[in-house]
Amino acid sequence: MPNLVVDFDKVLTLAGTDLGYSEYREITQEQVNLFADATSDHQWIHVDPERAKDGPFGAPIAHGFLTLSLLIPLWSELFDVEGASAKVNYGLDRVRFTSPVKVGSRVRLQATIAEVSEVKGGVQIKVANTIEIEGQERPAVVAEFLARFYS
């Protein structure tokens, strides 16, 4: 169950709402390998643990876009809207990959609803997201995510 569940007619009142934190999720080598297969990005810093030990990060790292894609499952732990006929991932305004995520690390999402606006047939929210790496000061990803909810 998400941290916050609201009725569709309340979404316009949510600007500035801190959604808190998701649970931590471990990044596994299997997950990285599957992402590499799905995207045809088999760079050795991701998929060759032996070679990556001697690389710039001392271990294999997750693809930046793999870490970014975790926004969706982590986001589902934080927020939901009841009474919407459709829920759409509308896009991203700003994304920065600020720190590599080593395989075996655990990440979580912190999110705040930054803006809310009406759109034809519904409501759009802009969410300020930070994907944190457990035990590290610098986050993995900072992104502004746009979602739309239609009546």
Regions found by a protein language model. Name each.
Residues M1-L14, P100-S151:
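HotDog/MaoC-like acyl-thioester-processing domains
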Residues P2-A62:
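Catalytic strand-loop segment that frames the active site of acyl-thioester-processing enzymes
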Residues A15, Y21-E23, Q31, D41, ...:
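A generic structural signal for short beta-strands and their flanking turns/coil linkers
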Residues K53-A59, S69-Q110:
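Hydrophobic beta-strand-centered segment that forms part of the acyl-chain substrate-binding groove
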Residues F65-T67:
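A solvent-exposed, acidic/Ser-Thr-rich amphipathic alpha-helical stretch
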